[in-house]
Design a protein with these regions (language model features):
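Short, C-terminally biased terminal segments at protein or domain edges
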Residues: 1-107
């Protein structure tokens, strides 16, 4: 949830700069990660659980793209980019491990 809160703070900054298109995109993908992880907790079976985690992983990958774009275009400082990207990378690693474990337990 902390990552999503940081993304929402970034969205607020971007909207103050009237960058609504990219703000909306990173807002959707960045907050969707946690929402899909939360949904996975109440999945209707193993396949649904894996599906929700894979969706969260896709959203984390998309968020990484938006973070890089914002940094390269000057909207995100190197310090802010590194902080958010490190957290996003950690989320991706956790999701990959969780999906792989769940798939292994599926057999």
């Amino acid at each position: 949830m902390d990552f999503a809160v940081e993304i929402l703070a970034l969205v607020k900054e971007l909207k103050a700069q009237r960058e609504t298109i990219v703000a909306n995109q990173i807002g959707r993908s960045g907050t969707s990660i946690g929402a899909n992880i939360r949904e996975a907790q109440y999945a209707q079976g193993k396949a649904d659980f894996i599906s929700k985690l894979q969706i969260a992983l896709k959203e984390a990958n998309e968020t990484g793209y938006w973070l890089e774009l914002l940094h390269r275009s000057g909207y995100l400082s190197m310090e802010a980019y590194r902080s958010l990207d490190t957290k996003c990378t950690s989320l991706r690693a956790m999701l990959i491990a969780s999906v792989n474990t769940a798939k292994g337990n599926k057999k």
